[in-house]
Amino acid sequence: MRIGILGTGNLATALATGWARAGHDITIGGRSAAAAEAIANRIGGTARPVPAVATDADAILLAVRWDGVTEMLTAAGGPTGALAGRPLIDPTNAVEHGVGVLQTEPARSAAEHVAALASGAHVVKAFHMFASQRWATPDASPVTVAMCGDDERALDVVGSLVRDVGGVPAVLGKLDRVRQLEEVAGFVIGLAFAGVDPRSAIPTLPS
């Protein structure tokens, strides 16, 4: 699969590495052309300017900080339909650093904001619950990757990419449920910064 990655940070690097290892063709671009080139050289991928990253991509990953989402999607041509028809993976967490409180408008999710800026793209919320290093190296114990999205084919594509890096995809619903999923991420982040293992706050199911 041809995957276009928008961003050059830790998550972009980790998923690019994992997907390249699984045999996918990776194209990457970001605000720093030098950073994109360095990642591409490391994984055997291709670096391109941001407007060209999604040109022939089968799926696109938006891996930037929340405050860079609008700038990146605009540069990639999202508002003019340049990403239309493809799965657009949104792993962003629109939360206050170290606190976990959502910074989006009430009743609006980060993924809905992404969808509004990416005309015609099939947005799938995924990869927003675990730290980037979880995806950088293979792990014998798979983790569940909760996902939301409106397009069944896009969910299938992203689900296969989740499996390629050692995750187990779990579709929780359409984008009208995604704010709930983002609130859970905020809860986990808040606990982690408070020095509490978030796993200890989730009840185990009876056997």
Can you say where each PLM-predicted feature lies in the sequence?
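Rossmann-like NAD(P)-binding element
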Residues: 40, 44-89, 93-98
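Rossmann-fold NAD(P)-dependent oxidoreductase module
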Residues: 14, 18, 117, 161
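NAD(P)+-binding Rossmann beta1-loop-alpha1 motif at the extreme N-terminus of oxidoreductases
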Residues: 1-42
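Rossmann-fold NAD(P)-binding glycine/threonine-rich loop
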Residues: 84-87, 92-137
